[in-house]
A protein has these predicted regions:
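Charged, surface-exposed helical/loop "interaction arms" that form contiguous linear patches used
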Residues: 143, 147, 157-160, 213-214, ...
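Conserved catalytic alpha/beta cores of large enzymes that bind or transform nucleotide phosphates
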Residues: 291-322, 429-430, 434
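ATPase nucleotide-binding head domains, primarily ABC-like/P-loop NTPase cores
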Residues: 12, 82-83, 93, 264-292, ...
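Secondary-structure capping and boundary motifs in well-ordered enzyme cores
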Residues: 70, 82, 103, 123-133, ...
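Glycine- and acidic
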Residues: 2-8, 90-94, 114-119, 139, ...
Length: 630
């Protein structure tokens, strides 16, 4: 299929070829074609901050990771939109932040203006809240699946546009003016819908009772005929009761027999000769009369003709509405943009966000930054803010060490999320910030094996790391958490060190990087490489207990406190005590004096041996230690 009608040359790019294939498939498989697809635009990757799929997943931008709650995503925090179109657009903005500083600043200007005028913002959001999903309604119009309620929703939504335009006219901003000019009021369409359909129609036109009285003289006549017939039938019951003397006589209707007269068994001797028996039941019999049958034909005929005419009138209205597809779609896009910007302004006001300064530099300075998801979830308690300083020279890489559970991973994720928010045009949870736009964001956070592809946890980790090293640029932001932990200590440390060196030294990389690790040896990079700074997550020790302060401070940590975390997790006390003993042995010497691994010898036994024999134990075959519970 050619897309030349959309302004593309044949086989211009692979993306154009793919779009043509999708459009051809859609036309072949949709019953009513693709008339609602009026525009196809080619977007350059250079326009947007690229976030690879694993980073989108690790950062939980729009979808929670397996086992996480739905409110753990960035989109959940930002999406307080009032329309379905606005919600979908916000999702696109979260997944595809901008790189163009001018466009980012345009959005920031509107968010800031709305934030500073809360009364007008509230009025605008209240007006927008009544607008239905115009994009979906347009699709249904062109597929001939829109029902009467869809058209009423369309009419009520279009009727709110003049109010939206009046509110927007207050603001003197170029982007708002552009959005306002794109809004079409479509009073002719709104009027025709209101003059044709009743205010609360049934879901389907085939149910009847859809068209407003006075819309069609022919329909009014048919309805009048049917109504008169039903009135005649209603009067027939009292008339026949008086004629026959049967007070319990009833006139009913069902779809099988139509109208009928029902007489109980005890009154059958009073049935007139002109009654024709149709059905015998246990307690009664049902009859018809020639007069009743004739009136039934008139009523049913009028009803059927009225329903058929209603369906035709509705389909004509639906086809007429479909001729406004371009204008309705234009309204949907403009309203979605306003709704998304209002949502960002509402979040900025609700959570006390600041406006970041965004430019094309390599600077990334965040003062008092907060994790947006945790900050929103912890409204009743204080989230500990932290600073971030990265640039392309003296602060190119942050090596972050510290205890397990102290908040290293949260902190480095926070940095990526704040950059994404800033490049969306959103305000961010911080005291102040200078954000030099990034071209790509990469994260290597967490890992799990991929059984379906036969890949181990470490293989997945290395594949993600390879993707980062092969695609990062000096304008990228890299977030690394525990590189090399999926293999042996020496292998892992060697890989982590060489990865850090590659990022720092390779001319095509040299990206701003945050590197969280438990390999304390990596902190020595700061001694031999320019641009590396060591930071740690502060803790406070009280005897055998530690308190996590959640504060990022300069310098390297000297402990990981893994045994403390194991204790918090509820490991048996025997395991904790033995772990402390093994750790002490390992820290003293990796290999015991008798060429036995020091892990297998307790310090108490070693001390007793020395006291008894006056020297270290002599070499002898290794003996496996018994279980803790033997």
């Amino acid at each position: 299929m050619t897309l030349e009608g959309f302004g593309f040359r044949q086989k211009e790019t692979n993306a154009v070829r793919a779009a043509g294939a999708v459009l051809a498939y859609t036309e072949d498989n949709l019953k009513c074609g693709t008339g609602h697809i009026r525009r196809i635009s080619l977007k350059s990757r250079d326009e947007f901050l690229l976030i690879d799929p694993s980073s989108r997943r690790n950062l939980e931008l729009a979808d929670p990771m397996l086992g996480s709650a739905k409110d753990s995503t960035l989109l959940h925090v930002l999406d307080c939109s009032k329309t379905p179109m606005g919600g979908r657009l916000l999702r696109q903005w979260v997944l595809n932040p901008l790189r163009n500083v001018e466009r980012i600043v345009e959005r920031q200007d509107i968010v800031g203006t709305f934030k500073d005028d809360p009364l007008t913002l509230a009025e605008l959001r209240e007006t927008i809240s009544g607008i239905r999903d115009l994009a979906r309604i347009t699709t249904k119009l062109n597929m001939n699946t829109a029902n009467p309620r869809d058209l009423i929703s369309l009419s009520s939504s279009l009727s709110l546009i003049p109010g939206v335009r009046n509110i927007l006219a207050i603001f003197d901003l170029p982007l708002i003016a552009d959005i306002n000019t794109r809004l079409c009021e479509l009073g002719e369409l709104t009027g025709r819908i209101l003059n044709t359909l009743i205010d609360s129609p049934p879901a389907s036109a085939t149910d009847g009772g859809v068209i407003r009285e006075g819309c069609s003289p022919e329909l009014d006549e048919l309805r009048s005929a049917a109504t008169e017939g039903r009135n005649w039938v209603a009067q027939l019951q009292s008339k026949e009761q008086e004629r026959t003397g049967i007070k319990s006589l009833k006139v009913h209707y069902n779809r099988v027999f139509g109208f009928y007269i029902e007489v109980t068994k005890s009154n059958l001797e009073n049935v007139p000769d002109d009654y024709i028996r149709k059905q015998t039941l246990v307690n009664c019999e049902r009859f018809i009369t020639p007069e009743l049958k004739e009136m039934e034909s008139k009523i049913m005929g009028a009803d059927e003709k009225a329903k058929a005419l209603e369906i035709k009138l509705f389909e004509d209205l639906r086809s007429y509405a479909a001729t406004f597809t371009s204008e309705i779609q234009q309204n949907a896009e403009a309203l979605a943009e306003i709704d998304a910007l209002c949502a960002l302004a509402d979040c900025a006001s609700r959570y006390s966000y600041c406006r970041p300064h965004v430019d094309d530099s390599d600077t990334l300075i965040i003062r008092g930054g907060r994790h947006p998801v945790l900050d929103a979830a912890m409204r009743d308690s204080r989230f500990i803010p932290n600073d971030t300083v990265l640039d392309g020279e003296d602060n190119r890489m942050m090596i972050i060490t510290g205890p397990n559970m102290a908040g290293k991973s949260t902190y480095i994720r926070q940095t990526a999320l704040l950059v994404i928010m800033a490049q969306m045009g959103s305000f961010i949870p911080a005291d102040s910030a200078v954000i030099g736009v990034a071209d790509k964001i990469f994260t290597r956070v967490g890992a799990a094996d991929d059984i379906s592809r036969g890949q181990s946890t470490f293989m997945v980790e290395m594949l993600e790391t390879a993707n980062i090293l092969n695609n990062a640029t000096p304008k990228s932001l890299i977030i690394l958490d525990e590189i090399g932990r999926g293999t042996s200590t020496f292998d892992g440390l060697s890989i982590a060190w060489s990865v850090a060196e590659y990022i720092l030294d390779h001319p095509t990389c040299r990206a701003r990087t945050q590197f969280a690790t438990h390999y304390h040896e990596l902190t020595e990079l700061a001694m031999v490489r320019r641009g590396v700074k060591n930071y740690n997550v502060a803790v406070r020790e009280y005897g055998d207990q530690i308190i996590f302060l959640r504060q990022i401070v300069p310098g390297a940590a000297d402990k990981s406190y893994g045994i403390h975390v194991a204790k918090l997790a509820g490991l048996p006390s025997e395991v904790i005590l033995r772990a402390k003993e093994i750790l002490a042995n390992l820290e003293e010497n990796a290999i015991g004096e008798a060429n036995l691994p020091s892990v297998t010898i307790s310090r108490e036994k070693r001390g007793r041996y020395r006291a008894k024999n006056g020297g270290p134990p002599q070499p002898k075959p290794a003996i496996l230690q018994p279980s803790l519970f033997d």
